[in-house]
């Protein structure tokens, strides 16, 4: 009799609920970065591992549960991360649905991990259908749990970072220490366990060639962030604001493999703070330049961390886009969320500098921060229109579990999606029908959401923006964006507001 698979790493299907119609042609299909890293770690510790990416395979909840039950692993690990770190919470409902269906089919032990479970481990254990919850980044917890499941004499109390039930009571173990030698402990992703042809880049990432969005990969070069922005929950799995990096030699080795074995040229660097450590960035760029690869890479940057020397290297290495966190057009509002280290003049100068190196800018803005008013939100949109960057993401402020803003919202008793009468965790999705952002001291959640949706249309249909698209990328891209604007997301908030009084 063959031994059971030790670990099945599962990505539940959530894209359609999270992005509505935008999921079909416009949003990315992201490879599961954390599953790839965890698989490599576990393999190095003699565990048998497989990855079930139900999202990429187009499986529904029932099909996903049936596949897990058919594989019957020793442990099914639900890896709840989204396209960026704060997107974990909105993926929780899909995981719950699959796990409930799985529990009805058999007795497969389940563990849930991700930013959200790490932020609320006790609540997750009590409210969700999983057998176990992981608090922390995961590798040591999963390995320890597999060892305990293989040999029942091992106590669950010995598994670091594990939450489990004992005699009807939730028990949380001491956290696992963070991995520090990333090159040795998490040396890369197990791409051989994935069908790399299924993944595609964001539409804007490939504006230079919309027909070449696949193949695509997401490559982590660091973990964590040293900053403490109030709206961000990135450090929830790590327990502290800090930055750990893989070496440039390790990173180029992974890029070599992507290019050689999978034909990947579209690459996302999801590190929140990629353009921060000058030596790290230049070391990676120099190695790419030496190889002469023709890549299409995007990465995040901060307004106050972009230097000319770094930009020159990024451009030569194939970094065609930088995502820039501008957040608000109001200095007062930026001050309130720990983003006040730079002013509007700095923002304009940084955007101009990035573009002068031939790098496109994807600017990120947030409406509905705690100090926002109608006037300050309009100022943010006016700044976006003035900058006229090649792409813009417009978000509503969300008090994500694990962020300081969530703690503040609970203390001030602000309305949150997970309140008793709220839509639940899906309400933390920016694009879902059930989206439920924070109110501000001056505006209701409905007003914030309505402004965000109007801002999206105003920006992407603005004649100046459309003209810039045509000049920079050509008429087909302008036509593509116009088609995108026809897919207006529906909102529960607006439907409720539009109902006639009984």
Task: Please identify what each model-predicted range represents.
Residues 39-50, 102-108, 261-262, 291, ...:
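A structural motif corresponding to the C-terminal end of an alpha-helix
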Residues 123-143, 313-322, 379-394:
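Structural recognition of alpha->loop->beta junctions
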Residues 184, 189-362, 369, 374-375, ...:
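Radical SAM [4Fe-4S] cluster-binding motif and immediate context
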Residues 1-9, 65-69, 404-502:
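Radical SAM enzyme core and accessory elements
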Residues 14-20, 85-87, 118-122, 227, ...:
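Flexible glycine/acidic-rich beta-alpha junction loops that bind and position SAM and/or redox cofactors
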Residues 2-252, 263:
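Acidic, low-complexity intrinsically disordered segments
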Residues 78, 135, 269-271, 324, ...:
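Conserved beta-strand positions
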